[in-house]
């Protein structure tokens, strides 16, 4: 995730593509984007294509009211809401920049998942695509020890 005070979302795709993981790795690991029909995702063409017109990803939409079509992404969204609740001023709980967002994402991706046989998403990423894991760590994400994972808003102010 890229911290942004603005929409549209294609700016975040551009940032991931150019700054964070690079064009080649982005195409390899994010060649398909499955999303809901939220307003921030309406400009599929700009999400799919770079400034030079080359394709970066393909965007597909779930059917309306069918969040189950996004599988484990919905579970991750639920975990994100443990840290970043709806109806709360996110700045007031400590989400102020990319560093604080990285803290939240690091804790979520460090927690063991039953559907991954007790492994964390980071552990799976390190095994399946070490190059991507390295880029994520260079971007500022960190693997947190499983017994130190916090999935509450206090993680943003925890020292």
Role assignments for model-derived ranges:
Residues 9-12, 29, 43, 76:
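Amphipathic alpha-helical interface surfaces
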Residues 1-24:
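Active-site beta-loop-alpha junctions of metal-dependent nucleic acid enzymes
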Residues 45-47:
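Short amphipathic alpha-helical segments
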Residues 26-27, 53-55:
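Short, structurally constrained coil/turn elements
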Residues 3-8, 29, 38, 67, ...:
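A short glycine-/small-residue-rich loop at the edge of a beta-strand within enzyme catalytic domains
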Residues 25-43, 63-67:
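Acidic/histidine-rich, metal-coordinating catalytic segments
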Residues 49-50, 56-144, 151, 156-158:
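Charged alpha-helix within mobile-element recombinases
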